Amino acid sequence: MSRIGNSPVAVPSNVTVTINGQNVEVKGPKGTLAIDVPEPITIAQEGDEIVVSRPDDHRKSRSLHGLSRSLINNMVVGVTEGYTIKMEIFGVGYRVLAKGSDLEFSLGYSHPILIKAPEGITFAVDGQTKFSISGIDKQQVGQLAANIRRLRKDDPYKGKGIRYEGEQIRRKVGKTGK
């Protein structure tokens, strides 16, 4: 029995949910998100709650049950509050600059790296080493943060690189010379 899938999704008063077959569209103060729910899962709106149910207890139905409920909940939270991921850069000469709505990174390569903001994503730069990624789609914000982090992953020996704010990197001891 899916503990996540069985709990209904609460819908605030300023959010409108439209269910059209397997398509769910959520409109809120920050924007609109839509998703196609996989086939065996059924969605129904009961008052100010969305109930996600499955027809049987097959393994695939059970896994899609919790997934569908979580995706709908993430959409409701996204259009009301939004999602923000804060990141920081460590390293001598490593910095980030805001170029309009885009970010330009200087990460020790021979060229600067320009990251364009996808539609629905905004960047905020705080100083030269801290920035944040904001948007209403949790998956898009998280994927963009992971792609930016991959530009210069943290070095366990020197501690240089891009990391999430508050992330602790396990440091390694270097070779001891004679």
Curated annotation (Swiss-Prot):
Report the record's Gene Ontology biological process terms.
cytoplasmic translation
Instruction: Offer an example of a GO molecular function term for this protein.
Output: structural constituent of ribosome
- Stored InterPro entries: Ribosomal_uL6-like (IPR000702), Ribosomal_uL6-like_a/b-dom_sf (IPR036789), Ribosomal_uL6_a/b-dom (IPR020040), Ribosomal_uL6_bac-type (IPR019906)
Pfam assignment, any one = Ribosomal_L6
Summary of the function given for this chain in its UniProt record: This protein binds to the 23S rRNA, and is important in its secondary structure. It is located near the subunit interface in the base of the L7/L12 stalk, and near the tRNA binding site of the peptidyltransferase center.
- Which NCBIfam families did the record assign? L6_bact
- Indicate what this protein is called per its UniProt record: Large ribosomal subunit protein uL6
Organism for this UniProt entry:
Corynebacterium kroppenstedtii (strain DSM 44385 / JCM 11950 / CIP 105744 / CCUG 35717)
Taxonomic placement: Bacteria, Bacillati, Actinomycetota, Actinomycetes, Mycobacteriales
Its gene is rplF
